[in-house]
UniProtKB/Swiss-Prot annotation:
Binds 1 FMN per subunit. InterPro entries: Flavodoxin_fold, Flavoprotein-like_sf, FMN-dep_NADH:Q_OxRdtase_AzoR1, NADH:quinone_OxRdtase_FMN_depd. GO terms for molecular function: electron transfer activity; FMN binding; oxidoreductase activity, acting on NAD(P)H as acceptor; oxidoreductase activity, acting on NAD(P)H, quinone or similar compound as acceptor. This is FMN-dependent NADH:quinone oxidoreductase. Disulfide bonds: none annotated. Its EC number is 1.6.5.-, 1.7.1.17. Keywords: Flavoprotein, FMN, NAD, Oxidoreductase. Homodimer. It comes from Methylobacterium nodulans (strain LMG 21967 / CNCM I-2342 / ORS 2060).
């Protein structure tokens, strides 16, 4: 199994999403010969999307014109990220919710994956995903409460966005491990961590 592990939190060792993503990877790789590729997108400081940073397979990448050494390195990095994603059997993502949505570094990574002809195509009936055979597990962490019973579900644009972009690429059944209410007091945080850790152990290995 080829497993791609992505972390995005800016909190380093204090990050709950990092803890949970690591637990998920440990759960999936225990007793296996998995090949794990790890990327810490917070540390990599991915630049936002431009024609120069698009993967070379993207039709709009030619708009960049001649690339200097810095731009060539950025494009090569984008190419590697796209191929890592396409080549992975399983993808594990740690995704904290920042200001109601995903971290900008995670968005920058996803922007490099949405490439026509590689991860989706436009067919007679609209977009068709091309990487539907992949398993994707996302550890989502939230400081507040945004579930249906909270009254704030309309402000939740992290899990909802991830479901949308993954489905666009053909991944229609992503799995989510959720820890929320982490900033709502020690009791709520402890309960959320206990529940999320238990959910990790219930994942099919």
């Amino acid at each position: 199994m080829k497993l791609l592990h992505i972390d995005t939190s800016i909190l380093g060792a204090g990050s709950v999403s990092r803890e949970l993503s690591a637990l998920i990877v440990e759960r999936l790789t225990r007793g296996t010969q998995a090949e794990v590729t790890y990327r810490d997108l917070a540390a990599e400081n991915l630049p936002h999307l431009t024609p120069a940073t698009l993967p070379s397979a993207h039709p709009l990448s030619a708009m960049a014109g001649p690339l200097d050494a810095t731009a060539q390195a950025a494009r090569a990095a984008s190419d590697r990220m796209l191929e890592e994603f396409i080549g992975a059997d399983t993808v594990v993502v740690g995704a904290p919710m920042y200001n109601f949505t995903i971290p900008s570094q995670l968005k920058a990574w996803l922007d490099r994956l949405a490439v026509p002809g590689k991860t989706f195509r436009y067919g007679a009936n609209g977009p068709e995903g091309l990487v539907g055979g992949k398993r994707v597990i996302v550890a989502v962490t939230r400081g507040g409460f945004y579930g249906r019973e909270s009254g704030a579900v309309s402000a939740e644009h992290a899990e909802s966005y991830l479901r949308t972009i993954l489905a666009f690429m053909g991944i229609t059944e992503p799995e989510f491990v959720l820890a929320e209410g982490l900033a709502a007091g020690d009791h709520n945080k402890a309960q959320a961590l206990t529940s999320a850790r238990a959910a990790v152990q219930q994942l099919a290995a």
